[in-house]
């Protein structure tokens, strides 16, 4: 049966995902940045309360995946922390200036991760040569690759995803970006073994007093009084679709 991973940005969201049938959680901070490394407090809380597998993302900033020496040092430290806390896996990725896997740095990450299952995240979708990159990741011992097939969403990239799945010695290929209940059957029918979804919605802040005259964000038009949360009903719906597809 296909595995359902839910992207979560808080302990509450991780618990919602777990309660509604998620098989695994990718734990992140900063949804507007596409996911950054969670704080130590969030990591410890989730480790204590969430029982399904949780893979934290290790990404020190938004933007590209070519990091300075200082940023890479922070990545290695975060990898060691996640390992010490007892998480079963993590999510990360590093590219060089030419859009290839930065093999020396990824080798250091794999050594620091030890027995943890490492997912190479959507840095893959920014690489120059996906098939060569897939071979490099297999050589590194990467467990899985999260990809939209190098398109803006995974449905548009499904043909590329299927090409990657068919590649010899490929890691597990997990489809992600825009995967929802209404299009999930396309991925299941194509034989995709793992799918990744935010299954989320914007939730209004409970604050009654709102100072509309300023913003805490660099984006002056950002909505300060809403947050992105996992929709439990959406997770349950996706899990039900997977189970019914398996029963066919």
Swiss-Prot record:
**Spans through the membrane:** none
The compartments listed are:
Cytoplasm
GO molecular function terms here?
A: copper ion binding
One Gene Ontology cellular component? cytoplasm
InterPro entries for this protein = CutC-like, CutC-like_dom_sf
Keywords attached to this entry: Cytoplasm
Q: Does the keyword Ribosomal protein apply?
A: no
Protein family membership: Belongs to the CutC family.
Q: How does it assemble?
A: Homodimer.
Name listed for the protein in its UniProt record: PF03932 family protein CutC
Lineage, highest ranks first: Bacteria, Pseudomonadati, Pseudomonadota, Gammaproteobacteria, Enterobacterales
Q: Which gene encodes it?
A: cutC
């Amino acid at each position: 049966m296909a595995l359902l991973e839910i992207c979560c940005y808080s302990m509450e969201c991780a618990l919602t995902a777990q309660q509604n049938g998620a098989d695994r959680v990718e734990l992140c901070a900063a949804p507007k940045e596409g996911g950054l490394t969670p704080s130590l407090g969030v990591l410890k809380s989730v480790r204590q309360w969430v029982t399904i597998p949780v893979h934290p993302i290790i990404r020190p900033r938004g933007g590209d995946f070519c990091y300075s020496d200082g940023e890479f040092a922070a990545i290695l430290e975060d990898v060691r922390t996640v390992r010490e806390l007892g998480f079963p896996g993590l999510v990360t990725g590093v590219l060089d200036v030419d859009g290839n896997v930065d093999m020396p740095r990824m080798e250091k990450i794999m050594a620091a991760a030890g027995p943890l299952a490492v997912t190479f995240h959507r840095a893959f979708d920014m690489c120059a040569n996906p098939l060569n990159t897939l071979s490099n990741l297999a050589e590194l011992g990467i467990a899985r690759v999260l990809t939209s097939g190098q398109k803006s969403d995974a449905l548009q990239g499904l043909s590329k995803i299927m090409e990657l799945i068919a590649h010899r010695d490929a890691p597990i290929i997990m489809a992600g970006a825009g995967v929802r209940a209404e299009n999930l059957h396309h991925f299941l029918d194509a034989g995709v073994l793992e799918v990744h979804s935010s299954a989320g919605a914007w939730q209004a802040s409970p604050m009654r007093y709102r100072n509309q005259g300023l913003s805490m964000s660099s984006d002056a038009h950002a909505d300060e009084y809403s947050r992105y949360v996992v929709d439990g009903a959406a997770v349950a719906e996706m899990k039900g679709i997977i189970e019914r597809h398996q029963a066919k």
